[in-house]
């Protein structure tokens, strides 16, 4: 009887750990959103055949731009793609696997798939600069074509943005 309880507890803990480690949409946003949008564009007969899914994905990719285009390149959905792991998308889609799980599998094959990120639009009037990551602070300065020579700490970047804010954010006020 104790062994049965122990097995149940171990299974529960393993399930809880897997849920905690599961990929979130924001961890792999371009992949998840692109896979969802592509899956929603498929009809029921196409969804059942992985070969039709691959053909449809190549057509889908031909009309993509920016981050989605790069995602297609990584998967092998473009003619100029150097590698092809398209079956890692098409077969799970034919099994009705959720986009998050598909992207989790794709990340294991090629980690740069989840490195793709959409550009964040930052409202300088309402955002607390202290809560932003350093890369976002650098992006603000880069968008303004400004640099921060000698900036090492987050506080240095924040100070530089605060100095330049009147010059660049006047249209947003």
Curated annotation (Swiss-Prot):
GO BP, sorted A to Z: dopamine metabolic process; dopaminergic neuron differentiation; neuron cellular homeostasis; neuron projection development; synaptic transmission, dopaminergic
GO MF, any single term: calcium ion binding
Signal peptide start-end: 1-22
Xref: SUPFAM superfamilies: SAP domain
Keywords: Developmental protein, Disulfide bond, Secreted, Signal
Recorded family membership: Belongs to the ARMET family.
Protein name: Mesencephalic astrocyte-derived neurotrophic factor homolog
Encoding gene, per UniProt annotation: Manf
């Amino acid at each position: 009887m104790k062994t049965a309880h122990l097995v149940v507890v171990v299974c529960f803990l393993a399930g809880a750990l897997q849920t905690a480690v599961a990929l979130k949409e924001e961890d792999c946003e371009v992949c998840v959103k692109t896979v969802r949008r592509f899956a929603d564009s498929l009809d029921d007969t196409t969804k059942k055949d992985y070969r039709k899914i691959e053909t449809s994905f190549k057509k889908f990719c031909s009309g993509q731009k920016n981050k989605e285009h790069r995602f297609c390149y990584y998967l092998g959905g473009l003619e100029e793609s150097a590698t092809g792991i398209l079956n890692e998308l098409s077969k799970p889609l034919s099994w009705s696997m959720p986009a998050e799980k598909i992207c989790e599998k794709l990340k294991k094959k090629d980690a740069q798939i989840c490195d793709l990120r959409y550009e964040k639009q930052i409202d300088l009037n309402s955002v607390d600069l202290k809560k932003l990551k350093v890369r976002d602070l650098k992006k603000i300065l880069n968008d303004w074509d400004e640099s921060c020579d000698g900036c090492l700490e987050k506080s240095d970047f924040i100070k530089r943005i605060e100095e330049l804010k009147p010059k660049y954010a006047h249209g947003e006020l």
